[in-house]
Amino acid sequence: MTKQRVCPVCGSTEFIYDPERGEIVCARCGYVIEENIVDMGPEWRAFDASQREKRSRTGAPESILLHDKGLSTDIGIDRSLTGLMREKMYRLRKWQSRLRVSDAAERNLAFALSELDRITAQLKLPKHVEEEAARLYREAVRKGLIRGRSIESVIAACVYAACRLLKVPRTLDEISDIARVEKKEIGRSYRFIARNLNLTPKKLFVKPTDYVNKFADELGLSEKVRRRAIEILEEAYKRGLTSGKSPAGLVAAALYIASLLEGEKRTQREVAEVARVTEVTVRNRYKELVEKLGIKVPVT
């Protein structure tokens, strides 16, 4: 528990900080509580964000999402320059951008990270997922795992792995829709990277329940149906019925059953389309869950 500062003269707890003198004084009696305080902030003043940006002499923090981690210098743009000077600055910026990616490895990394930015933006993935995917990709490059594989398939595989590691529900189908490579190729790269980066099944395990809200939102199902679907999935997990099964297929079947039980029926086709699985998969998982868990589904 922190002690509250009290003026030793009058007992007041109200103080004024004087940045010019570097002092803290009592607001009631004027007693100097502390002096010679070092101001760790900048020596300049700014009244808005643009002034702050112009006057700041330090760059942005390091970022794993930039190929050079943001440590290179950028030449800015000044629209008030005359024609000749503007032309000169344009040429300098052009050369500077070329120097930033001086060799093939740098160019490949820059391309991979721009592709990562595109995929994560379209999937509306949070920043920490993008950063984890970038970390995995850099590690794969360091270990020489990219050779013989397309950059697009490896970066898509890293996005999928990052989603699974951080328990963000995204299916391989969703990622392959955005990526410029086929699902099979992404799957191969994903398995190869997972094996060589020691991403064990335990680390990559995603509970089917993590997908419930995502699919239920798209189907417009109530909280009551979601809770029932989660109960079904948890019971299935306890009985070992989820092992080796696609989470999307299991969730689709559980939501289908729950929608029937709670009187909010959705067709197998509707559920299959949302989960990006076939109707046959939904039907097979449905039969298995109903039989093994002894669920009595109302006849419709």
UniProtKB/Swiss-Prot annotation:
GO terms for cellular component: transcription preinitiation complex. Zn(2+) binds at residues 7, 10, 26, 29. It comes from the Archaea. The keyword Nuclease does not apply. A zinc finger (TFIIB-type) spans 3-34. GO terms for biological process: transcription preinitiation complex assembly. Sequence repeats lie at residues 114-197, 210-291. Keywords: Metal-binding, Repeat, Transcription, Transcription regulation, Zinc, Zinc-finger. GO terms for molecular function: DNA-binding transcription factor activity; TBP-class protein binding; zinc ion binding. Stabilizes TBP binding to an archaeal box-A promoter. Also responsible for recruiting RNA polymerase II to the pre-initiation complex (DNA-TBP-TFIIB). Belongs to the TFIIB family. PANTHER family: TRANSCRIPTION INITIATION FACTOR IIB (PTHR11618:SF13), TRANSCRIPTION INITIATION FACTOR IIB-RELATED (PTHR11618). This is Transcription initiation factor IIB. It comes from Pyrococcus abyssi (strain GE5 / Orsay). The lineage of its organism: Archaea, Methanobacteriati, Methanobacteriota, Thermococci, Thermococcales.
